[in-house]
Amino acid sequence: MEVIVVIVVIVVVIAIVIVIDSNSNSNSNNSSDSSNESNNSDSSKNGGSDIYQFSSSNKPFLHNFSNNNPNYNINAYFRI
């Protein structure tokens, strides 16, 4: 019974951390929307190739495991 309680507590803590982190990421993205809109002309000069280039500060929590392969950007699947 105690083992089940410990597992439930761990799952709840992980879920809370993910929710808090996703909220902080969405807030930081909202604050940078105006700067992204002003840079649309720059992205069009580059052929729009910078759509999936995210700064390291905007990487979602627990999704930074793609460091072994720099050509594989997992963030492209989480931020459209």
UniProtKB/Swiss-Prot annotation:
- Write out the annotated subcellular location: Secreted
**Keywords annotated in UniProt:** Glycoprotein, Secreted, Signal
Q: Which residues are glycosylated?
A: N29, N30, N36, N39, N64
**Extent of the signal sequence:** 1-15
Can you list the GO cellular component terms from the UniProt entry? extracellular region
The residue ranges flagged as biased composition, category Low complexity, are 23-44
Disordered as annotated region, ranges? 23-52
Superkingdom assignment: Eukaryota
Claim: Metal-binding is one of the keywords in the record = no
Query: What is the protein's major site of localization?
Result: secreted
- The name under which this protein is listed is Putative uncharacterized protein DDB_G0286451
* Organism from which the protein derives: Dictyostelium discoideum
